């Protein structure tokens, strides 16, 4: 229904089937409307998120079902800022909050230090949290 910045699912009915959906994303900024979620993970999907911002929405992060079992292994956050009306919701809010508390994550208006990107050669090292909007938006974007 278009109410999530990212909604990621593995296979419904067989959530642990491989390959598991597990994107790696760095330097992303998601700004959603007040009635939306920034990220929703469910049905066994993972997410490696680095140097990113989840901002403005009703909820920053919702994790459900088999995805909860991936906290800290198939779900990792490093250098992530959560600043929404409610930062965390899901099937086990305490487990999600414990994961965030032990990660390089800041909740609120001040971003955390930049995280360490995977040394796989795909990402370029930088010290920016979120998208570097001013350097790339040019004349083709709006609302930023």
Which stretches of residues belong to each language-model region?
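Extracellular beta-rich repeat passengers
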Residues: 1-144
């Amino acid at each position: 229904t278009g109410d999530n910045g990212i909604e990621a699912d593995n296979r419904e009915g067989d959530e642990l089937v491989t390959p598991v959906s597990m994107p790696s994303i760095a330097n992303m900024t998601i700004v959603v409307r007040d009635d939306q979620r920034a990220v929703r993970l469910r049905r066994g999907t993972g997410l490696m998120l680095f140097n990113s911002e989840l901002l403005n929405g009703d909820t920053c992060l919702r994790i459900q079902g088999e995805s909860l079992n991936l906290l800290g292994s198939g779900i990792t956050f490093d250098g992530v800022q959560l600043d929404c009306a409610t930062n965390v919701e899901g099937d086990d809010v305490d487990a999600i909050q414990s994961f965030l508390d032990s990660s390089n994550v800041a909740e609120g208006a001040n971003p955390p230090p930049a995280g360490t990107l995977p040394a796989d050669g795909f990402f370029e090292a930088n010290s920016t949290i979120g998208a570097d909007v001013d350097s790339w938006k040019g004349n083709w974007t709006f609302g930023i």
